[in-house]
Amino acid sequence: MIKVSTEGLTQRYDRFVDDCIIALFDKEPADTDYNISITLKKFVGDNGSHAGFCLGDEESSEIEVATHWMYEDDEVVPYTDFEIAGSIAHELTHAKQFARGQINMVNNVWKTNDLSTDCDHLPYEEHPWEVEAYAYETILTDIYWG
């Protein structure tokens, strides 16, 4: 069972999270035990430059999603509800990848279909886990938020 706890999310975001969990984790075995904690906070990262972040392993993930970001002149800019939903979908995709053992917090290796691929040489946006997360970010927000 996928257990999700949230902090700072409105009811609409909670419904969106539920829809994303069903879409992302539908192929997991029935006896899967995985815990996901999602916290909505004003800023993520030291300088408010991240829209979201996911730390995890094969047992649980901790997700933080920002409601605002810091512009170069220290101007505080709010994310739109749609952008926040996109960040939630993106980070939930990483939680799925952690749960399946496809990624870890140690190295830049992508594991899928019993193959491991070293991705140290790839730019950030070409890492397979980011390609998948950006794709699901778009798909899930278009289907369940739009």
Q: What spans do the regions from the language model cover?
A:
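An active-site-proximal "capping" alpha-helix that borders the catalytic cofactor pocket
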Residues: 128-141
